[in-house]
Amino acid sequence: MCIRDRCKYHGLEVVVYDQVESNPKDYNVMDAVSLYNSEKCDSFISIGGGSAHDACKGARISVAHDGRNVNEFEGFNKSENPKNPPHIAVSTTAGTGSETSWAYVITDTTTDPDKPHKYVAFDDAAVTTLAIDDPVLYYDCPVAFTAQCGFDVLAHASEPYVSRLNFPPSMGNALHAVRMTARHLRE
């Protein structure tokens, strides 16, 4: 039984938006916002990896601000309304850690349509209400996809070590994460 069927079994109404692309675009987010509003939804569940979670974070920030364009929230803590709808993030891959982060990455296709650019928004209001990371959900992933996610983990794990904004605890955690990833990625 899939997650949607389980929700329906327990009496929850479910509306699905399944058009999120890798490296989610602003129009993915705004389409999700339109669906959310037209169906009178009251919460979000994102299922997947970083792209699904990031798009959902952007959508919930936009919904909390009466559907303002997600690109208006690029930068640090640009949202003014902390009363976002609840967001449950269910991970089916392990790569970005988006399900537990205050950051989300969106591709802006509207500011300069000839040169879309990715940006990061950091917002306390983007932190998910609940993150579900059940390794059982990863078992059905193809080996090649799991390896790609592992390299994504490795890239994200090394970022705090090489960042100019690092500090000793972040460097230690980064090194530990790199070692763990290297050890387990071989398996």
Region spans (language model):
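A glycine/threonine-rich phosphate-anchoring loop and its flanking beta-alpha core
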Residues: 65-168
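Active-site segments that bind and position negatively charged phosphate/pyrophosphate groups
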Residues: 160-187
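N-terminal loops that bind phosphate or other acidic moieties
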Residues: 38, 59, 77
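Glycine/serine-rich anion-binding loops at beta->alpha junctions
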Residues: 41-57, 92-99
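Short helix-loop-beta junction
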Residues: 6-13
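Helix-loop module immediately N-terminal to the HCX5R catalytic loop
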Residues: 16-40
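Short Gly/Thr/Asp-enriched flexible loops that form oxyanion-binding sites at enzyme active sites
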Residues: 31-33, 52-65, 100-101
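Short, small-residue-biased leader/transition segments that mark boundaries at the very start
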Residues: 1-3
